[in-house]
Amino acid sequence: MLFGVIVVTCFLLSRSANPVKFFNPTFRQPSEGEGKVKLERILERAATADKTVIVTTLNEAWAAPNSIFDLFLESFHIGNGTTTLLKHLVVVALDCKAYDRCLAVHTHCYLLNTPGTNFSGEAFFMSPIYLRMMWRRIDFLKSLLEMGYNFIFTDTDIMWLRDPFPRFYPDGDFQIACDFFWGKPADLFNQPNGGFNFVKSNNRTVQFYKFWYESRIKYPKLHDQDVFNKIKFDPFLREIGIKVRFLSTAQFSGFCQPSKNLNRVCTMHANCCTGLHKKIHDLKVVLEAWRKFSSTPPKLRASRPISWKIPQKCRL
């Protein structure tokens, strides 16, 4: 199902050089077809030559100035080879204030309509609003695959420090980061984290995402990540032939199992951490450590591993 956009106290026109837009306070919910056309237009502008986009979701709580979203964008600007990736980033706003904030600072913004649900506040882990938000995300990503787009999905509390594309497995259909990685990329006992994944659009991944989304009915009290941990062993995945690969925490890292070597790390996720203020504090520590690392002479970087002292407030 493709979702339309809702226009309630939101700017109507797409992002331009001048962020001041025409404002229309009149409620109007476009049809599903109109929403699909708008989304397709955004995807076409953002996609790479092989129809790949980078996607993140954003709500009001994380969109506020000096909050998670600003740190997320900053990481692209100071990362190694990541600035040019911003032109491929599509920010999917879950409420009007997040949408307005996105339009003020970024190019590709899309407002995802969720009738009867308010996603603007901080969604605490495993709360009913959190579960609805996670499954809404899976359904939306499924629609991108159906439209023929490959994507990297990234949570906004992930700092992009290096271009991840060269680190993906060429044979993987569905590649996912981990809370805990046990050493082998095809080992189903790795503990994945749904906050970062690279998915190629093909019949296998479309079938898989449909199966994943439908499995929420079988496991009504679990979020998408826990449901994935159930279905990754299901014979259906072998039947459709999907190749699942788990990404090493040495490169695609997080606070659960932080990489100790800044010479290798691509991304750093504020996982295993609850509380917005804790995340913000520790992600600022990450960016400051990265700035110091980046200013270190290359010969010194190569001569010994350079690490960082994280997590701090997010410590388990």
Regions found by a protein language model. Give the residues of each.
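Active-site-proximal specificity loops/subdomain of glycosyltransferases
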Residues: 67, 91-147
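Juxtamembrane luminal stem/stalk of type II transmembrane Golgi/ER carbohydrate-processing enzymes
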Residues: 1-68, 73-74, 81-85, 104-108, ...
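Extracellular/periplasmic catalytic domains that process cell-envelope and extracellular macromolecules
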Residues: 45-50, 102-104, 144-145, 168-170, ...
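GT-A fold catalytic core of metal-dependent nucleotide-sugar glycosyltransferases
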Residues: 111, 132-192, 196-203
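Catalytic core and acceptor-binding pocket of nucleotide-sugar-dependent glycosyltransferases
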Residues: 7, 198-316
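Short active-site oxyanion
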Residues: 84-90, 150
